[in-house]
């Protein structure tokens, strides 16, 4: 019994050992297979990473090559541009050099011609001097013979006869002297006239400028006809707000493709034009938005005036100049006289005056400075309403400008005599610039003066802040200060302005006077959570 149990136990033990061996073998196979699989997976991942790295490197190489090609192309383009620019500069410099050489040759020929003429005149004078000496000897001989004859036949003493002959000779010599003086004066005037014509002709031939006249309207294209409704606004609130803040008339074309801004004041029209362009581009057109954009554009334009003046000073090579004068030069861009832009006219005068002064032996730089500043007072006439000559003299004296500049401001309107070559050059250049065909339009200037006169009448009254002449002078819109004028005073001011216009105006028609008084209160609400 016990031996049988032992046998069974041995069998069980052997079976367990065999099972354990089998399990060990199977597990070993499984772990080996898993290891192989993991190894293959790691190898595949390594190959994938290697492939990705290689692809990335190749892509980077392609990108770098593309970038290199692009940079190379940019370098070549820039090099080509610089080369073209320098070639143009070189051609321009050669052209200037050729012009200078031609000018020097012309001057040399002119001087040689003058020298020959002077030598010829000197020889003539020498010949006349010799002839005069010979005639004097002949006269003395004739005088002696006549004296002897008269002493023989007349009852005069020798001294009396001598005095008679001397008086007669003196009268004859005085007559000859007067004739010679008149002849030389005539020749000098003719020669001076020819030379002045030659100088003016050469100055105008060497000057090349842009000739442009100012219109009284500005046209702005509309993206589509729907914008007409946006600009007008509900019940016309937008267009009324725009007219009120800008003082500019606005009209629409028949085909609704554009609108037209009309004002004699170039600066006011420029601000209004830029404001309307921004509003149309943005699409948000509301009364508050209109006022906000208008004031922002006005501030930006004021800042640009100094930059504009500095550009003109650099262009004309005038050297140092006070900032106030530069700002006033920039402001002249928005002023006109008889339809001619004031800044363009002043630049023309400066360039022409420099050329003329150079020909006459004057200071070219000083003549240019006097030319650009001769109408500087026009930048202040719309604000101060006084004569531009006196305004220009005041501002130039305040900044201690050269007396030649002051003399040019006075002399170009005949308030003073011309005291220098530079001043004469400015006066001649001013006449050339203003007198050329098509430079000025008298009708436009008369219209602008009529509009400005209406605004000046309104601004004379106490409490008036702004005044805008609109609708071609048929309407005068006046804005009064709410802290100085009460509501019951508004009709009285309107009637007074209308009466003053009736007394002052010299043209037929009606002018509607609209006086506006407005109070605004602004506060800020703070929101708390």
UniProtKB/Swiss-Prot annotation:
Q: Which Pfam families match?
A: HD, KH_1, RNase_Y_N
Q: Provide the transmembrane region boundaries.
A: 4-24
The record, for SMART domains, names: HDc, KH
Report the subcellular localization. Answer: Cell membrane
Output the InterPro entries linked to this UniProt entry.
HD/PDEase_dom (IPR003607), HD_domain (IPR006674), HDIG_dom (IPR006675), KH_dom (IPR004087), KH_dom_type_1 (IPR004088), KH_dom_type_1_sf (IPR036612), Ribonuclease_Y (IPR017705), RNase_Y_N (IPR022711)
Domain (KH): give its ranges. Answer: 216-297
Which SUPFAM superfamilies does the entry link to? Eukaryotic type KH-domain (KH-domain type I), HD-domain/PDEase-like
Per the record, membrane topology reads: Single-pass membrane protein
PROSITE patterns linked: HD (PS51831), KH_TYPE_1 (PS50084)
Alphabetical GO CC annotations of the entry are: plasma membrane
GO MF terms here are: RNA binding; RNA endonuclease activity
Recite the UniProt keywords alphabetically: Cell membrane, Endonuclease, Hydrolase, Membrane, Nuclease, RNA-binding, Transmembrane, Transmembrane helix
Reported EC number(s) for this entry are 3.1.-.-
- Name the GO terms of the biological process aspect: mRNA catabolic process
Q: Where is the HD domain?
A: 342-435
Annotated function: Endoribonuclease that initiates mRNA decay.
State the family named in the UniProt similarity comment for this chain. Answer: Belongs to the RNase Y family.
Q: Fetch the PANTHER family from UniProt.
A: RIBONUCLEASE Y
Q: What is this protein called?
A: Ribonuclease Y
């Amino acid at each position: 019994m016990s031996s049988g149990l032992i046998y069974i136990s041995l069998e069980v033990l052997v079976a367990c050992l065999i099972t354990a061996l089998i399990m060990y073998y199977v597990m070993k196979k499984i772990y080996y297979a898993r290891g192989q699989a993991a190894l293959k997976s790691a190898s595949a991942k390594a190959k994938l990473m290697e492939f990705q790295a290689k692809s990335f490197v190749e892509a980077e190489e392609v990108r770098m090559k593309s970038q290199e090609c692009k940079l190379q192309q940019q370098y070549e383009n820039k090099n080509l541009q610089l080369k073209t620019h320098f070639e143009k500069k070189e051609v321009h410099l050669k052209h200037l050099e050729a012009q200078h050489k031609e000018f020097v040759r012309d001057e040399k020929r002119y001087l040689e011609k003058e020298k020959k003429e002077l030598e010829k005149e000197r020889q003539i004078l020498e010949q006349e001097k010799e002839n005069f000496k010979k005639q004097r000897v002949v006269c003395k001989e004739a005088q002696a013979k006549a004296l002897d004859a008269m002493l023989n036949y007349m009852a005069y003493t020798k001294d009396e006869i001598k005095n008679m002959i001397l008086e007669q000779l003196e009268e004859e010599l005085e007559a000859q002297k007067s004739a010679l003086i008149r002849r030389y004066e005539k020749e000098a005037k003719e020669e001076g006239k020819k030379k002045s014509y030659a100088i003016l002709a050469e100055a105008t031939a060497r000057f090349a400028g842009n000739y442009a006249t100012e219109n009284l309207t500005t046209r702005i294209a509309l993206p589509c006809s729907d914008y007409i409704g946006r600009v007008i606004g509900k019940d016309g609130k937008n267009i009324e707000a725009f007219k009120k803040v800008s003082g500019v008339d606005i009209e629409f074309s028949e085909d609704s493709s554009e609108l037209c801004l009309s004002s004699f004041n170039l600066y006011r029209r420029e601000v209004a034009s830029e404001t309307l362009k921004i509003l149309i581009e943005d699409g948000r057109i509301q009364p508050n938005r209109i006022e906000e954009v208008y004031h922002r554009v006005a501030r930006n334009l004021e800042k640009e005036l100094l930059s504009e003046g500095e550009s003109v000073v650099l262009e004309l090579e005038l050297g140092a100049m006070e900032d106030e004068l530069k700002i006033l030069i920039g402001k002249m861009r928005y002023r006109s006289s008889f339809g001619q832009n004031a800044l363009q006219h002043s630049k023309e005068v400066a360039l022409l005056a420099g050329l003329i002064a150079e020909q006459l032996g004057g200071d070219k730089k000083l003549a240019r400075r006097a030319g650009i500043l001769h109408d500087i007072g026009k930048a202040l006439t719309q604000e101060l309403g006084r004569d531009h000559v006196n305004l220009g003299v005041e501002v130039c004296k305040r900044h201690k400008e050269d007396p030649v500049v002051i003399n040019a401001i006075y002399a170009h309107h005949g308030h003073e005599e011309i005291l220098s070559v530079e001043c004469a050059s400015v006066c001649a250049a001013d006449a050339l610039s203003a007198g050329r065909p098509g430079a000025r339009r008298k009708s436009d200037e008369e219209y602008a003066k009529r509009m400005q006169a209406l605004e000046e009448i309104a601004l004379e009254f106490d409490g008036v802040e702004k005044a805008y002449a609109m609708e071609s002078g048929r309407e005068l819109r006046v804005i009064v200060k709410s802290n100085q004028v009460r509501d019951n005073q508004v009709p009285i001011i309107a009637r007074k302005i209308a009466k003053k216009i009736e007394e002052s105006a010299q043209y037929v028609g009606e002018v509607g006077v609209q006086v506006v008084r407005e109070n605004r209160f602004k506060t800020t609400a703070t929101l708390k959570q």
